[in-house]
Amino acid sequence: METNFKSVHTPKDIIISTIVILAGVGSYVLNPALGVTLASCGLLMLCFFKKGYKADGKEQVLTKVAMDMSASYLQPLKDFLGGKSIDLNLGEASKGGPVRLEVYFNQAAELAYAQLYTFSNYTYEPAVGTIELHSKQAEKLISMLKK
């Protein structure tokens, strides 16, 4: 299953950009150059600062987490994404390596998309396609990532 993700604004992104713009407008009275610089930075942040993701055809805003780990985690992760109930400690796996796990998730909706890559010839190549996880399996993966 090929799922494309596009960057979108989150409410937090808009609030931060608005605060920087307002700080620029407010400081324009004291120092016009500083005010213009801050307001310009706020406008640029509004254009380019996007921390949320949306899957094609879905409305939920997702958060992205990427983790590099050793090759010994490849098969257990494939098994977990395939539906087997496996307990993994990904906290000690995050030391880097040739396997990359990218997870796009929305904890409130109990929805996650996982992509698993292997590193070879200086590029990441998909080890498995994008896998959509729901409810308990998504919740378990999100809790493993936060350990």
Which residues are covered by each model-predicted region?
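Transmembrane helix interruption/hinge and helix-loop junction motifs
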Residues: 26-35
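A membrane-cytosol interface segment of integral membrane proteins
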Residues: 111-147
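Hydrophobic, membrane-inserted alpha-helices
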Residues: 16-26, 41-44
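Non-transmembrane, membrane-adjacent beta-strand/coil modules in membrane-associated proteins
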Residues: 84-125
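Juxtamembrane interface helix immediately N-terminal to a transmembrane segment
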Residues: 1-17
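Cytosolic juxtamembrane segments of membrane proteins
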Residues: 54-99
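N-terminal low-complexity, intrinsically disordered "leader/linker" segments enriched in small/polar
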Residues: 2-5, 55-59, 104
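Transmembrane-cytosolic junction motif
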Residues: 11, 36-68
